[in-house]
Amino acid sequence: MAGEPDDVDTMVEPVVPSRHRWLAGLLGAGPGDRVADLGCGTGGTLAQAAPAVPGGLVAGLDLSAGALARTAEAVAGAVAGQDRPPGALLVQADLKDPLSLATAGFDRVLCHNVLEVLPDHDALVAEAVRVLRPDGRLVLAHSDFDTLIFASEDLELTRRLVRAYCDTQQPWMDAVDGTIGRRLAEIAGRAGLQVTDVQAQVVLGRRYLPGEIGWGYARNLADTLLGAGRADEAELDRWMAGLQRLHDRGAFLFSVNDSAVICGRMPR
């Protein structure tokens, strides 16, 4: 990928434990399983999955060295004191390139919030299929950024900002496809996979405070659109001040839809 945010603390993923519990549940890994997370970020999902795979392996690939360091800490903390903790393999990798993982080496493979930023979605999915064991499970999951909801004092401005954000390529992205979450089954089908289930969840935030998901997305939206010249500073300041007032009244609300397809190889 073109790059990653310099400061992994600005990422919104780690502050949504419910999302990572959901993803780990979809993987359904068990003792001895080998689990790979392609684009693991700071390790939220691997930390949820690791305790379920004693004697197995959790592998995380990400472009950001800082995120991988956080993943190592998260996984170690999650399995501390376990009799047979899984091994951990963390690899700094650009997911545009072929994966440095063994063919048919993993029982469970996850790709979450990665496909949008790659120019060739199908290439990464093909690599995910390659490293999946014949009876393994692949989970493709993605937020649909066109479903971002902010309670707002200016509905039309919010709609315009969200649409622009959904369609704007950030500097660290090689591509942008903000509605990809609704097309995961199509992508899986092109790879010759059998979709066994489709799931969705709503990620919800009720507070507009640093470290909360609604705050994180609002700030990233503002920085992205200002940097791309798609919104001016005055209207963004006005919009965020309105979000703060809603929070102060107990009326702030944020949500985004996450979709996932659970896949396996077609039976022969």
Task: Kindly give the residue locations of the regions a language model identified.
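A short glycine-rich, Lys/Arg-flanked "PGG" loop and its adjoining helix->strand segment in the class I
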Residues: 122-134
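Conserved alpha-helix/loop element of class I SAM-dependent methyltransferases that forms part
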Residues: 14-31, 48
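C-terminal helical/coil "lid" or tail adjacent to the Rossmann-like core of SAM-dependent
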Residues: 2-7, 196-254
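Conserved catalytic/acceptor-binding region of the Class I
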Residues: 139-208
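Class I SAM-dependent methyltransferase Rossmann-like catalytic core
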Residues: 1-17
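Class I SAM-dependent methyltransferase SAM/SAH-binding core
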Residues: 36, 42-98
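A short SAM/SAH-binding and catalytic strip from SAM-dependent methyltransferases
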Residues: 107-121
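A short acidic, Gly/Pro-enriched loop at the edge of an enzyme's catalytic core
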Residues: 99-109
